[in-house]
């Protein structure tokens, strides 16, 4: 099984961009990739249906990527609040069922979280219960800030204590020409202090948008995809 759960620790870390980019790369390499967003808050009301902005971005990169969301709420807040206002309680069995269907149709499925691992989904379950139930490894997306290392350590340690399988960390929005020793040392600090592997570095992009080809190239060159999926990818030898 080559499926992973992608989550963030700090806000605006860009996990949707990373998730979509990895899926687009794998699709371009000839694999059938999927992105599953179990819970989408801030969905767009199109009248007859709700539209997931995150999955729309995925489709913009590659329309052939399989996508799905089980629960969608227009309110842009934590799922626990959104589902109470929307009168739809989040059930891990529903998520597990949809996950199994999607996993059977794809070569690899990237499951993207809403919020962090400790985000409450209802009175008794948190986001970390999703990868725990699905039995898939977790990848953290973080931005380089030594001021937040304590938060990163606490989040990763909490995940380990919960029994989650941690695949590693992807550092997003990393300055290409970092002149700060603190920023330069950030990847090593994460590996040594948090005892977790850095799977890749993705640079900062100017503006709020990124071209598909640019993102695919950045992912190919910046992330160890074989470590992400824990598999050999023969076509990568040609890049």
Predicted regions and their residues:
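C-terminal lobe/tail of nucleotide-utilizing enzymes
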Residues: 157-239
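Glycine-rich phosphate-binding P-loop
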Residues: 6-19
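Short internal beta-strands
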Residues: 37, 139-142, 167-173
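Hydrophobic anchor at the start of a short beta-strand
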Residues: 32-33, 109, 138, 166-167
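Phosphate-binding/switch loop-helix module in NTP-utilizing enzymes
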Residues: 78-121, 128
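Inter-motif core of Ras-like GTPase G domains
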Residues: 122-145
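N-terminal phosphate/diphosphate-binding loop that engages ATP/GTP or pyrophosphate donors
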Residues: 17-89, 100-101
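Extreme N-terminal starter segment of soluble prokaryotic enzymes
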Residues: 1-5
């Amino acid at each position: 099984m080559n499926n992973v759960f992608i989550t963030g620790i700090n806000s605006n870390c860009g996990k949707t961009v990373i998730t979509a980019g990895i899926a687009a790369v794998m699709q371009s390499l000839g694999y059938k990739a999927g992105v599953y967003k179990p819970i989408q808050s801030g969905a767009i009301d199109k009248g007859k249906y709700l539209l997931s902005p995150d999955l729309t971005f995925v489709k913009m990169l590659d329309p052939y990527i399989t996508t799905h969301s089980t629960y969608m709420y227009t309110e842009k807040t934590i799922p626990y609040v959104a589902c109470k206002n929307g009168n739809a309680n989040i059930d891990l069995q529903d998520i597990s069922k949809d996950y199994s269907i999607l996993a059977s149709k794809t070569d690899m499925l990237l499951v993207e979280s809403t919020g962090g691992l400790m985000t409450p989904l209802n009175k008794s379950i948190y986001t970390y219960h999703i990868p725990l139930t699905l039995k898939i490894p977790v990848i953290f997306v973080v931005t380089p800030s030594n001021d937040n290392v304590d938060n990163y350590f606490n989040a990763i340690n909490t995940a380990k204590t919960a029994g989650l399988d941690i695949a590693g960390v992807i550092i997003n929005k990393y300055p290409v020409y970092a002149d700060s020793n603190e920023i330069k040392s950030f990847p090593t600090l994460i590996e040594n202090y948090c005892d977790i592997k850095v799977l890749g570095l993705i640079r900062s992009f100017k503006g709020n948008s990124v071209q598909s080809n640019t993102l695919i190239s950045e992912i190919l060159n910046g992330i160890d995809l074989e470590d992400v999926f824990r598999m050999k990818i023969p076509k990568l030898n040609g890049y």
